[in-house]
Amino acid sequence: MFQLSVQDIHPGEKAGDKEEAIRQVAAALVQAGNVAEGYVNGMLAREQQTSTFLGNGIAIPHGTTDTRDQVLKTGVQVFQFPEGVTWGDGQVAYVAIGIAASSDEHLGLLRQLTHVLSDDSVAEQLKSATTAEELRALLMGEKQSEQLKLDNEMLTLDIVASDLLTLQALNAARLKEAGAVDATFVTKAINEQPLNLGQGIWLSDSAEGNLRSAIAVSRAANAFDVDGETAAMLVSVAMNDDQPIAVLKRLADLLLDNKADRLLKADAATLLALLTSDDAPTDDVLSAEFVVRNEHGLHARPGTMLVNTIKQFNSDITVTNLDGTGKPANGRSLMKVVALGVKKGHRLRFTAQGADAEQALKAIGDAIAAGLGEGA
């Protein structure tokens, strides 16, 4: 994981416009020995090609491929502008993270930062922070509680099972492996009868042994009988804060609407969307899957091209990295798209709902096939 030094963070700075802000960041990169004097020209040129504004008040100015020879060593400089700097199209940046990288070394850092910065509350804290130490803690995620663990790694779907104990053991093992529970939780979760929520869904938890919030889901290939009641899926919850409540509410809503069968039929990505997103696909949604061929995945430039393509349409569009966490993201947010951690060869599923959904998916597919501004 990239380590950010407080010496690389500059709180309380001022800039009259975007160009002045970029020049300040470039000068700091030169001073730190990251780049030569000519790198600033690449940073300004990059901004002319594609805005480096990520969203949530964050911009990531960096050079073009033509100025990679100006990079002496990979590094970043973070500038905070409490009064804000207009970054174009009504966008205001309060934090600019200047990046110097000669290859794709910065992509891991970028994904690390976007996972932190995609939290709206953290972005607001970055704006109001007053010290380099506070900014560093926010950027490195040290002030964040661990996010709810519910992704592809927590799912066991369509297994051969004829009793709840099999599902209980699988979920307990997943939670233990994720560091979410201790041995006490595992013992209780396996020995105590889960709660029947109805429609084939059962729930398991424990008041003891919760180390972090996480949810594991196991689903049988075929429903089976438990003392005259139907069982098909078990949801096991480790609760160390209130994060699981939102998931349980979505689950309750599906049950109240008699739509729990959607969970029993869904693939992994759709199941995660139903439990973790308020923008989960409905029955009338269209979807399509495409493979990213860009050498360095979806970093800022191709990510921007993708988001700009999506913004041409009125439909609600989400994107899921099927080779990542499996959670859907708002396709109109560059920050959330970059945070998906898309690498070359990863499969993306797009869902679109609206009058122009079909046209949107075709345009997205064409844009990806064309290389998202980097050539096919």
Curated annotation (Swiss-Prot):
Domain PTS EIIA type-2: 2-142
Entry-linked SUPFAM superfamilies: HPr-like (SSF55594), Phoshotransferase/anion transport protein (SSF55804)
Compartment list: Cytoplasm
Recorded GO MF terms: kinase activity; protein-N(PI)-phosphohistidine-fructose phosphotransferase system transporter activity; protein-phosphocysteine-sugar phosphotransferase activity
Keyword entries, A-Z: Cytoplasm, Kinase, Phosphoprotein, Phosphotransferase system, Sugar transport, Transferase, Transport
Region feature M domain, mapped onto this chain: 156-284
CDD domains: PTS-HPr_like (cd00367), PTS_IIA_fru (cd00211)
GO CC, any one term: transmembrane transporter complex
Domain HPr, residue spans: 285-375
Modified positions (Phosphohistidine) in chain numbering: 62, 299
Biological role stated in the UniProt entry: The phosphoenolpyruvate-dependent sugar phosphotransferase system (sugar PTS), a major carbohydrate active transport system, catalyzes the phosphorylation of incoming sugar substrates concomitantly with their translocation across the cell membrane. The enzyme II FruAB PTS system is involved in fructose transport.
Protein name in the entry: Multiphosphoryl transfer protein
Species of provenance: Escherichia coli (strain K12)
